[in-house]
């Protein structure tokens, strides 16, 4: 049985609903509480390295604890840490003196890692996570004299660093584990950690471990990763069947997600739809409604399996089977026609991504709204649902622009990658069947700018702008004034 299922109904609801948008003044103390403290990050992968770089640049003392075998073999974590001039040591040499130990190893390693860390950590130390899976989905009891906190940036580690270097940050959830707040200082430490990664600049939600895990799993399985992967494969194949050049088709998809979702950062679904002509907007709206209708049951099934723990049980079983399903899905993805598509050296103008990508816009709108709606129906608060659907989407799209789906799956967590493939396996045949009957002007060429009915356009605009995710989005984006724009690929 996992931790979540040991809670009674009232406790489950209270933890799922915990969500408070924090005011800027709550970060006035900056990271003073962590200055001159010994902070040890365990693991130096994508999140570990990039959070550590930000924290060091914010004036903190950071070192990395790796397994002795990793140090002897000089594996990738050792290379990441030493190349960036961090102090590296084994658990026994660094953990006993650490004031804050941040566990940023892959989820599947957490049980064994935390078991070792607890034996070495001093009394009244803090143990940090950036994803609460190990706490919520497994019955993991932590020593009562250890304070357990979480700072969860809502994006891959690479984007945590890139946004920080731009002088901004990424939206972040912070939490203190109900069972482990020994010193009553957990929230203050979490705030200082979030400040040090730059999260305070983009907005921080005070949440719970439960709310973070359940919403995070839903977002990454559906719109953030699963829908992007499924749509990339299906849209590319459709473009090829309509006689588009493979290089052009690949580039339109690879860079199209990043270009189109850039508008989400600044003006939500409303701005994304406003980038289309009036006739294209109405067409995208109709397509999105159809996509929502046939996708609803799949989204709800994933949410139900996440809430019940069924998803986690199946994934943990795959871990025990040496990632048999995960590795098979990864191999299949690597060998898809989209991943193997040739380079295309001609420039695609920014507006062309919208004009030739009406279907892509429709898929994004449908997936964002459906993911958000399904989370809300399950008790997750609007702010959390926004962060885990619309807000993080441009940051995931950025990774596809670098090296297609390979890059996305390499930088997201092992848990996210598994959930992504699981969703895509079911969604792919459904979406593929749908696109058989779309118009050529829905993808790959532009829809003529025909005259439209004023009343129809007015009603479409009203429905777009009054969707609950747009209402909460306008509030949250008011905190995010300094976001930098991308260079169009």
UniProtKB/Swiss-Prot annotation:
Annotated family: Belongs to the ketol-acid reductoisomerase family.
**Function description:** Involved in the biosynthesis of branched-chain amino acids (BCAA). Catalyzes an alkyl-migration followed by a ketol-acid reduction of (S)-2-acetolactate (S2AL) to yield (R)-2,3-dihydroxy-isovalerate. In the isomerase reaction, S2AL is rearranged via a Mg-dependent methyl migration to produce 3-hydroxy-3-methyl-2-ketobutyrate (HMKB). In the reductase reaction, this 2-ketoacid undergoes a metal-dependent reduction by NADPH to yield (R)-2,3-dihydroxy-isovalerate.
Question: What general EC class does the enzyme of this chain belong to?
Answer: oxidoreductase
Name the catalytic site residues. Answer: 131
Protein's recorded name = Ketol-acid reductoisomerase (NADP(+))
Q: List, separated by semicolons, the cofactors it needs.
A: Mg(2+)
Where does the chain bind Mg(2+) 1?
216, 220
């Amino acid at each position: 049985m996992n931790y979540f299922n040991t809670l009674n109904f009232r406790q489950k609801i209270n933890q799922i609903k915990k969500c408070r948008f924090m005011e800027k003044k709550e970060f006035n103390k900056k990271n003073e509480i962590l200055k001159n403290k010994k902070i040890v990050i365990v693991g130096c992968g994508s999140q570990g390295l990039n959070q550590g770089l930000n924290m060091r640049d914010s004036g903190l003392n950071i070192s990395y604890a790796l397994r002795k075998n990793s140090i002897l073999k000089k594996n990738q974590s050792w290379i990441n840490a030493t190349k960036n001039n961090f102090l590296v040591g084994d658990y026994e040499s660094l953990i006993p003196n650490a004031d804050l130990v941040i566990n940023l190893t892959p989820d599947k390693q957490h049980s064994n890692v935390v078991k070792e860390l607890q034996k070495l950590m001093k009394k009244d130390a803090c143990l940090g996570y950036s994803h609460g899976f190990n706490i919520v989905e497994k019955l993991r009891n932590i020593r009562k004299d250890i304070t357990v906190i979480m700072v969860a940036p809502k994006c891959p580690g690479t984007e945590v660093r890139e946004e920080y270097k731009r002088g901004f940050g990424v939206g972040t959830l912070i939490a203190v584990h109900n069972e482990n707040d020994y010193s009553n200082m957990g929230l203050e430490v979490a705030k200082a950690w979030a400040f040090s990664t730059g999260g305070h600049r983009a907005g921080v939600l005070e949440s719970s471990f439960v709310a973070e895990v359940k919403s995070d799993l839903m977002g990454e399985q559906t719109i953030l990763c699963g829908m992007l992967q499924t749509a990339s494969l299906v849209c590319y194949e459709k473009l090829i069947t309509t006689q588009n050049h493979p290089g052009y088709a690949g580039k339109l998809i690879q860079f199209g997600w990043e270009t189109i979702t850039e508008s989400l950062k600044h003006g939500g679904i409303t701005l994304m739809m406003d980038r289309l002509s009036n006739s294209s907007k109405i067409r995208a709206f109709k397509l999105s409604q159809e996509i929502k209708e046939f996708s609803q049951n799949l989204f709800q099934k994933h949410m139900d399996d996440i809430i019940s723990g069924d998803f986690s049980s199946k994934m943990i079983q795959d871990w025990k089977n040496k990632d048999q399903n995960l590795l098979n899905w990864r191999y299949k993805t690597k060998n898809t026609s989209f991943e193997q598509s040739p380079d295309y050296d001609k420039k695609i103008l920014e507006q062309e991504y919208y004009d030739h990508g009406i279907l892509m816009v429709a898929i994004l709108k449908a997936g964002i709204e459906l993911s958000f709606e399904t989370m809300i129906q399950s008790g997750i608060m609007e702010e959390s649902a926004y962060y885990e659907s619309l807000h993080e989407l441009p940051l995931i799209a950025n990774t596809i622009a670098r090296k297609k789906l390979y890059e996305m799956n390499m930088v997201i967590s092992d848990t996210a990658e598994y959930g992504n493939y699981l969703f895509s396996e079911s969604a792919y045949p459904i979406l593929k069947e749908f696109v058989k009957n779309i118009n050529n002007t829905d993808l790959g060429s532009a829809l003529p700018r025909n005259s439209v009915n004023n009343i129809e356009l007015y009603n479409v605009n009203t429905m777009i702008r009054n969707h609950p995710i747009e209402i909460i989005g306008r509030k949250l984006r008011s905190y995010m004034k300094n976001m930098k724009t991308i260079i169009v690929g």
